[in-house]
Amino acid sequence: MGMCSRQERIQKDIDVVIQKSRAEKDCLFADFRYSDSTFTFTYVGGPKSVSYSVHVSEDYPDNTYVSSSENDEDVLVTTDPIPVIFHRIATELRKTNDINCCLSIRSKLQKENGEESRQNSTVEEDSEGDNDSEEFYYGGQVNYDGELHKHPQLEADLSAVRELYGPHAVSLREYGAIDDVDIDLHIDVSFLDEEIAVAWEVIRTEPIIVRLHCSLTQYLNGPVPTVDVFQISTKERFGLGHQLKKIMQTFVSQQWKQSKDKSNCPHGKKLSEKKVKSPLHLFSTLRRSPSYPPPGCGKSKSKLKPEQDGISKTHKLLRRTCSSTVKADDMCAKSHRTFGRSLSSDPRAEQAMSTIKSHKLLGRPCPSAGKQEDCLTLKSHKLLTRSCSGDPRCEHNTNLKPHKLLSRSYSSNLRMEELYGLKNHKLLSKSYSSAPKTSKMEHFKEPNAEGRRLSLTSGLIGILTPSSSSSQPPTNGAKSIPIRDRGFLVQTIEFAEQRIPVLNEYCVVCDEPHVFQNGPMLRPTVCERELCVFAFQTLGVMNEAADEIATGAQVVDLLVSMCRSALESPRKVVIFEPYPSVVDPNDPQMLAFNPRKKNYDRVMKALDSITSIREMTQAPYLEIKKQMDKQDPLAHPLLQWVISSNRSHIVKLPVNRQLKFMHTPHQFLLLSSPPAKESNFRAAKKLFGSTFAFHGSHIENWHSILRNGLVVASNTRLQLHGAMYGSGIYLSPMSSISFGYSGMNKKQKVSSKDEPASSSKSSNASQSQKKGQQSQFLQSRNLKCIALCEVITSPDLHKHGEIWVVPNTDHVCTRFFFVYEDGQVGDANINTQEGGIHKEILRVIGNQTATG
């Protein structure tokens, strides 16, 4: 936040201690020294000299270690600054002459505050000893009151957050003596589906904390704050936080600079012209570490204020974060944003539209159609977020003057053709209503209780992400800056809210939109730009392979097998996409595997050097890595890439959640749709219903499918089979049809319910030999696979007997993935349309995808 370096802050604290000691006539300490991040001083006031050591870390004052020469093994770990530590030791020595007093003090404080700490999950020391030490730390100049020197604009912004989101949406920790404050903004992510949250390693019942470290007394006029992003329960391993932290730091830095040019307060409060000074300004360069948990939240799963004025929280979120800028040549309106509920249908609206230059329609309804004519005469205004219906004062809106109101912006620059395309799909009725070329507007529907999590992202249909059948990159709507009409903190929350649902659409390093043929996928990843690849692999952004193998070894085993199949295919030039981007471990400035200089033989050599995943689970990972590095230094980096480049969420299903009729132990839950597509899918499902069907494809194709999604291969170089029934994704309710597309019937026979019992017995015998740990991993390189998908039963679904064609990729979502090895056969007579089969599928899905 523009403050002094760590060393300067530490030196200032040490100088305070030395100056304070020299000013005392009967000082108990001498020989003050500081070197190698360790501050030492010697107690000389007793019969025995004792040396105390304070070792500071990189995140000082957090993780500060205190020990004495009398007891080196008993070390105190504290978050207090050096002056506080020194004062407590001196105070206790005068009372007890206990040379290990610093440790006893800490024990005492922890005991006294243990109850409060458990309730608040924060480090707050309120004992009398703390007050004494704080008086020393603050120089005794003031009896510190946390509210005394807080900047008035900060007060106003905090009030705006609490009013809009509820009292638990923001918490802060003040350090008045060092002119610092930690502002924790609690971002609700409960709208994410459980499986999507798991794929992103996010706890959806716990808010994401965006912490701002800024000046308590200067606020927007002070230095640019630093930003931290975390969840309390996943602080150690929160991969999404790296991406979001960089996004929020960039946003805060840009908006902070603009704030310095604007000293006005939009809340109507008069700011004092008197310059506010913080007590003990010599500590102004100190700043607390972000490691403190936010006060009042801790492990409590407190959510944001669920309802306000009768509108659900997710609907409010949609209303605040989403809008569209419609390009129309026959309208004078330049910016027409509609959310939440629409105006009542009124033929006069078309005529009145031409008088509007620029306005924003928010998610609150006008009281009646009769009053819209009066409302539309306003030339430039923003409608209040609070509901007008039921408020008699709104009947007099003819006297309204142009004014600022509480609108939010999620710009998306949709063209007219896109809007009509959305309307034709009947997906606008719930969340988006705009008919620029018609005289009537569709009614918005109030979300019911069951669809509250849906209402946030279902309203992003065609806005947060383009149609997956389009080759256009995502729009920059998620990057649009919300209007600051409720203060900087509300603006920051809104920006975080609109970025989180679409993090997967942007590179985790450069934050530029991914450009994929089939639209965004589920898991966030890095783009193919070389600088981003270097940063991703060398700066520790991606997860370690060891972590993935520890939590999902069978999935890693499958990913490696798919990579091998694609690489061994005679069609590898076409289907081995993406090609690896791997930094050379011996030369971090070069790419060992470069998509621009493809060398398939070298990749295969490295792949052959990867130790089997089963062996990795049976020995220390570091030893396995050393063996791989010795055999081929590119083997382990390639394994890292195979894991991190996977953009789908795959989980090995436990035995009790497997589909028994599929006759294979290798069953996986497979989700590849991002939140926006999944929400579009559920909205379409509510309109048309859905069913299940198989999709067969050679195992060599799945390396690309997991990273690019199911694509329409018809009439492209990816097409392997004929497209007799037109362009689209081919599915079948019959397993025998899809088994054929997977190539299973070429080298092995598909079993049937009517075959002799001897065939089934031999199959069962081969499977029974692979029990225990060995059966969890793939034993053969001759693999066949089949996917079970959920498909929307809309008029767009073309059924040609047992072959179905889906031209719209948004109407197909993968749910399960089944792998067969040599000796394993599937049932050719499975029909997903049979009641028993369909019921079993729904049982296994359960609540995992929120589609059952």
Curated annotation (Swiss-Prot):
UniProt keyword Iron, yes or no: no
Superkingdom assignment: Eukaryota
Record GO biological process: protein auto-ADP-ribosylation
Annotated Acidic residues bias: 123-134
This protein's UniProt keywords: ADP-ribosylation, Glycosyltransferase, NAD, Nucleotidyltransferase, Transferase
Catalytic activity, reaction form: L-cysteinyl-[protein] + NAD(+) = S-(ADP-D-ribosyl)-L-cysteinyl-[protein] + nicotinamide + H(+)
SUPFAM superfamilies noted in UniProt: ADP-ribosylation
Record-listed E.C. numbers: 2.4.2.-
Region entry Disordered, spans: 113-134, 289-310, 748-775
This protein's name: Protein mono-ADP-ribosyltransferase PARP8
